[in-house]
Amino acid sequence: MTNGNGAPPEAVAAPQLNVLAQYTKDLSFENPNAPASLAQQQQQPAINIQINVGANNLAENEYEVTLSVEGKAESGSTVLFSFELAYAGVFRIVNVPQENLHPLIMIECPRLLFPFAREIIASAVRDGGFPPLMLDPVDFVGLYRQNMERQAQQGQPS
C-alpha cells in the first residue's frame, strides 16, 4: 500500500500513557476532639469531601498530576475528624494529539490515581479511631467539564 506518491505510509505510533511514579505529596489527619469524638455517635456524621486535580509539565511528554482530596466529618457543630491528601503521579504521555492531551491529563491520570488515594484516606481515618471512610467513585469527566465551564465563565485559559 502506498500513500499516493508511491511511498509506503508512515507507521502511526499508538498513543501511550505510562505511570512513572506515584507518591504522597502531603497527608494530614486531624482528630481535634479525641478521645470524646471516638464515642459512639447518635447519628451519622455529615461528611463533606472536596476533590481537585492539578497538573504540571515536568519535561517533554512528562507530567505530574496531583489529586487533592480534602474532607471533614462533623456531628452537629463538632468536628470529628478532617483530612487533606495530595497524591500525585508522574506520567509519560506520547503520541497523543494535542487536542486530546489536556482531557487525558485531567481525567484519565487522576482516575488511575484515585484507588490509591482512596486507600490512603480509608487507612488514615481508620488509624484515627473511626471506621474506614470509603470514598465513592469520582466522575472525573464531570469534574473536568465543571472546571472547564467555570474557567470559561471567568475568562481564564485552561
Curated annotation (Swiss-Prot):
It is found in: Cytoplasm. GO terms for biological process: protein folding; protein tetramerization; protein transport. Keywords: Chaperone, Cytoplasm, Protein transport, Translocation, Transport. It holds the Pfam family SecB. One of its GO terms (cellular component) is cytoplasm. InterPro entries: SecB (IPR003708), SecB-like_sf (IPR035958). Its main location: cytoplasm. GO terms for molecular function: unfolded protein binding. The keyword Transmembrane helix does not apply. Homotetramer, a dimer of dimers. One homotetramer interacts with 1 SecA dimer. Belongs to the SecB family. One of the proteins required for the normal export of preproteins out of the cell cytoplasm. It is a molecular chaperone that binds to a subset of precursor proteins, maintaining them in a translocation-competent state. It also specifically binds to its receptor SecA. PANTHER family: PROTEIN-EXPORT PROTEIN SECB, PTHR36918. This is Protein-export protein SecB. It comes from Rhodopseudomonas palustris (strain BisB5). The gene is secB.
